[in-house]
Swiss-Prot record:
The active site is at residues 99, 195. Disulfide bonds join 99-195. It comes from the Bacteria. The keyword Transferase applies. This is tRNA-specific 2-thiouridylase MnmA. It is found in: Cytoplasm. Catalyzes the 2-thiolation of uridine at the wobble position (U34) of tRNA, leading to the formation of s(2)U34. Residues 145-147, 304-305 are annotated as: Interaction with tRNA. Belongs to the MnmA/TRMU family. ATP binds at residues 11-18, 37, 123. GO terms for cellular component: cytoplasm. GO terms for biological process: tRNA wobble position uridine thiolation.
Length: 367
């Protein structure tokens, strides 16, 4: 008796990575279906699958059924509103990590339920493995493309049904495969922008998303380290920790944004040295590779996507108003620990988990 093929749904964006992932799974013998998640459509959308004319290759071997799922309303509520509210709270959001959890994986698993699929797959550059009774997440082998930082919110339920075919490949290898598979997206350029922010201009996006915002917040005070007013800003939501450009102040030394006060509409500045800290508190912790720790533990952590993983001690603090919290103590000072961004914890190449940065703690003065 012929063994039934496992059915897998691949999230298709129209780009080269997801298309190559789908073709690799076809070659590996899976029954492959494509799912294109529509997130920027008008109206409320629906969660009913609809057939799509999308094709990924001119070769009949890779002609797979493709469906669409309109998640526009959910995307507005879960991602776009979050993005807007974080900036209004003087925080710097990371919409991609939220989208992966609440839109991509949730949508793919909903599609899998409707189509009777066993697994879901994406074109992310990361790896999974089942070791010692736990589904684990690892960095992609291509360090320039590794996307494990954006996947720290995933839980055992999602990882147990996830295939990441590109995790062991480099981007040039993926391009070569795309050409060999006859993919229409083989030479397509990558987009580095947030999909709903035209030209990556988040300031203009906020002004359109919050009518009257500019008039309401422009003209607030810019303060130097002593609290003296040295200028007026364009509106606190348009600044982020570590920013230097756009302050419009003339001082003897370069000044950087060190803190933002949304209630007082104030932007605090200081020298570059004021951006450094060795400790930060994080909330909304999610653990993947280990059970939640109850005692201090050693790891490494990234505080932004392109950051290098720095040695640290994770100190659990227990429940707080923003969820379970921990304090991260770095061995060496880190610059611009920005509220709203993610701190993602690693042990070697394995992602242990992560949390949302709530704020840096002042450095202890040298005796």
């Amino acid at each position: 008796m012929e063994r039934k093929k496992k059915k897998v749904i691949v999230g298709l964006s129209g780009g080269v990575d997801s298309s190559v992932a789908a073709c690799m799974l076809v070659r590996e013998g899976y029954e492959v279906l494509g799912l294109h998640l529509k997130v920027l459509q008008e109206g409320d959308g629906s969660t009913v699958l609809e057939p799509s004319p999308m094709t990924i290759s001119s070769r009949e071997e890779f002609h797979i059924p493709v469906f669409t799922l309109n998640l526009a309303a959910r995307f507005r509520n879960e991602v776009m509103d979050y993005f807007k509210e974080e900036y209004l709270a003087a925080r710097t959001p990371n919409p991609c990590m939220v989208c992966n959890k609440t839109i991509k994986w949730r949508g793919l698993l909903e599609g899998a339920a409707q189509l009777g699929a066993d697994m879901v797959a994406t074109g992310h550059y990361a790896r999974t493995a089942f070791i010692d009774g736990r589904h684990r997440l690892f960095a992609g082998l291509d360090r320039k493309k590794d996307q494990s930082y954006f996947l720290w919110m995933l839980a055992q339920e999602e990882l147990s049904r996830t295939i990441l075919p590109l995790g062991g490949l480099t981007k040039p290898e993926v391009r070569d495969l795309a050409r060999s598979f006859g993919l229409t997206a083989a030479e397509k350029k990558e987009s580095q922008e947030i999909c709903f922010v035209p030209d990556d201009d988040y300031g203009s996006y906020l002004e359109s998303a919050v009518p009257g915002l500019h008039r309401r917040v422009e003209g607030g005070e810019i303060l130097d380290p002593s609290g003296q007013v040295i200028g007026h800003h364009k509106g606190y939501p348009f600044y982020t920790i570590g920013q230097r450009r756009g302050l419009g102040t003339a001082t003897g030394e370069p000044l950087y944004v060190t803190a933002i006060d949304p209630i007082g509409n104030l932007v605090h500045t200081g020298p570059k040295s004021a951006l450094f800290s060795t400790s930060v508190e994080v909330s909304h912790l999610n653990w993947i590779g280990i059970d939640p720790p109850f005692a201090p533990m050693e790891a490494t952590a990234k505080i932004r996507y392109r950051d290098h993983a720095s040695p640290c001690t994770i100190i659990p603090l227990g429940p707080g108003p923003t969820g379970v919290t921990a304090r991260i103590m770095f061995k060496e000072p880190k610059s611009a620990l920005t509220p709203g961004q993610a701190a993602v914890f690693y042990r070697g190449e394995e992602v242990l988990g992560g949390g949302i940065i709530e704020g840096a703690l002042p450095m202890e003065p040298h005796p």
